[in-house]
């Protein structure tokens, strides 16, 4: 996905030679080739740079339009001819460094001292309560209510009849119609992308968005992180309780229900109509089918097919889990012998 300029300001293009110099990478390609964008390897377009990691055994998905790529030595043989190769022991770290040289989030840039930017578009029938901050390029639709001290970042779009609670903050997001976001929610912050590099742990910059479709409810003090390159998506009529965490690149389908304290890790997919009980945790990259039910406090580490009900930690089909619980109770409380 191309970086959305409404949320990220371009800082100027770089040549492959400049990129190699800044990252200490070994370049095989055209030194003067210009790079102006960043992306994942699977979705890159012309003039965009990506990274590829792996053990050298599995073929990665590579866009035919990819211009250049950071790659470790064991993955070089997968790179098609004509793609600029920057060899480094830390491909993801090098890519993150260059991404931060090419773009900067607009909400981290100076925007003046006015609470409501003159460059924001606010419908005449919208309500903006005292202390709210609305950044340049933001748009607030008809009938929307922006609560006291809420922050609507640069470029953010708020749909019609949508309610944003007091002290909520929304960055890098497109919010649909008739959405309810309760007090203190945090939408579009950087996700928990931690890289391990030569200097130790580093934060990975995020350049994606959050898409919240129509009729969604997001509870008080819940957090939905923006994607790394792709979008975090909350499907139509999904309902998220208070104090939930939705990580980067998660896609929740239509009509999903997430009860309080739910934690969904990065790149999880949850199908339409699925129900997650309180304190459910889902490990990263897991795929949950349609109409799946997860019992309260379930810890899910593997994919679940549509229509199934699971529980326990590690989560498993509900009948199997209940049999195991019953057996454990029996072992813990043996009958007294005469």
Curated annotation (Swiss-Prot):
GO terms for cellular component: membrane. Catalyzes the N-acylation of UDP-3-O-acylglucosamine using 3-hydroxyacyl-ACP as the acyl donor. Is involved in the biosynthesis of lipid A, a phosphorylated glycolipid that anchors the lipopolysaccharide to the outer membrane of the cell. NCBIfam families: lipid_A_lpxD, PRK00892.1. The keyword Acyltransferase applies. It comes from Hyphomonas neptunium (strain ATCC 15444). The gene is lpxD. The keyword Repeat applies. This is UDP-3-O-acylglucosamine N-acyltransferase. Keywords: Acyltransferase, Lipid A biosynthesis, Lipid biosynthesis, Lipid metabolism, Repeat, Transferase. One of its GO terms (molecular function) is N-acyltransferase activity. Pfam families: Hexapep (PF00132), Hexapep_2 (PF14602). It comes from the Bacteria.
């Amino acid at each position: 996905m191309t970086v959305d300029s409404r949320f990220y300001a371009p800082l100027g293009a770089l040549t492959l030679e400049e990129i190699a110099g800044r990252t200490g990478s070994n370049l095989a390609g055209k030194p003067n080739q210009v790079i102006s964008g960043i992306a994942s390897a699977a979705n890159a377009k012309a003039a965009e740079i990506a990274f590829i990691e792996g053990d050298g055994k599995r073929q990665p998905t590579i866009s035919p339009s990819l211009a250049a790529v950071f790659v470790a030595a064991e993955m070089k043989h997968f790179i098609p001819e004509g793609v600029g190769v920057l060899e480094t022991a830390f491909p993801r770290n090098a890519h993150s460094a260059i991404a931060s040289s090419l773009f900067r989030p607009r909400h981290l840039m100076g925007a003046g001292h006015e609470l409501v930017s003159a460059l924001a578009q606010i419908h005449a029938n919208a309500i903006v309560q005292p202390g709210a901050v609305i950044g340049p390029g933001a748009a607030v639709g008809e009938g929307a209510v922006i609560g006291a001290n809420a922050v609507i970042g640069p470029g953010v779009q708020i749909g019609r009849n949508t309610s944003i609670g007091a002290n909520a903050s929304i960055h890098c997001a497109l919010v649909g119609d008739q959405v309810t976001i309760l007090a203190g929610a945090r939408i579009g912050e950087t996700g928990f992308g931690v890289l391990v590099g030569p200097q130790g742990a580093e934060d990975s910059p995020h350049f994606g968005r959050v898409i919240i479709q129509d009729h969604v409810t997001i509870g008080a003090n819940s957090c939905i992180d923006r994607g790394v390159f792709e979008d975090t998506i909350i499907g139509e009529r999904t309902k998220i309780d208070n104090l939930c965490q939705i990580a980067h690149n998660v896609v929740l389908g239509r009509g999903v229900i997430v009860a309080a304290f739910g934690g969904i890790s990065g790149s999880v997919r949850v199908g339409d109509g699925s129900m997650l009980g309180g304190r459910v945790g889902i490990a990263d990259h897991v795929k949950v089918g349609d109409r799946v039910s997860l019992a309260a406090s379930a810890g899910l580490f593997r994919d679940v097919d549509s229509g199934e009900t699971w529980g326990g930690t590690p989560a498993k089909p509900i009948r199997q889990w209940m049999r195991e619980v019953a057996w454990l109770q029996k072992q813990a409380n043996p009958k007294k012998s005469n």
